[in-house]
Amino acid sequence: MFAVIKAGGKQYKVDRNSVIKIEKIDGELGSKVQFDQILMIGEYSKPSFIGTPIVKGAIVTAEITNQLKDNKIIAFKKKRRKNYRRKAGHRQELTELKILDITKQ
């Protein structure tokens, strides 16, 4: 069974026991998180339920396995011949989740 969830303004396709990295959400390591904004749910051999915009009664349960930072992104701009250079860096904080269960009532 798979589902498409909405988290942090992005969409992720998840299966049971899959591991995903999403934008940081608060929580302790090992704590459970439930997602109720499910855009689509289905099985590979049967037709899927597509939400309008979300599937009512569908819940995805996940466990927080790690809190980490992504690789550094460099933003650089310059103007030629003017000695104008600006450099900025950013490291996005991420949360790693293990999907435990996908249910639809």
Curated annotation (Swiss-Prot):
GO cellular component, one term: ribosome
PROSITE patterns the record matches: RIBOSOMAL_L21
Key words, A-Z: Ribonucleoprotein, Ribosomal protein, RNA-binding, rRNA-binding
Family matches, as InterPro entries: bL21-like (IPR028909), bL21-like_sf (IPR036164), Ribosomal_bL21 (IPR001787), Ribosomal_bL21_CS (IPR018258)
Gene Ontology biological process: translation
A GO molecular-function descriptor: structural constituent of ribosome
Annotated coiled-coil segments of the chain: none
Biological role: This protein binds to 23S rRNA in the presence of protein L20.
Alphabetical list of PANTHER family matching this protein: 50S RIBOSOMAL PROTEIN L21, LARGE RIBOSOMAL SUBUNIT PROTEIN BL21M
Annotated family: Belongs to the bacterial ribosomal protein bL21 family.
Quaternary structure and interacting proteins, as annotated: Part of the 50S ribosomal subunit. Contacts protein L20.
Full protein name: Large ribosomal subunit protein bL21
Gene encoding the protein: rplU
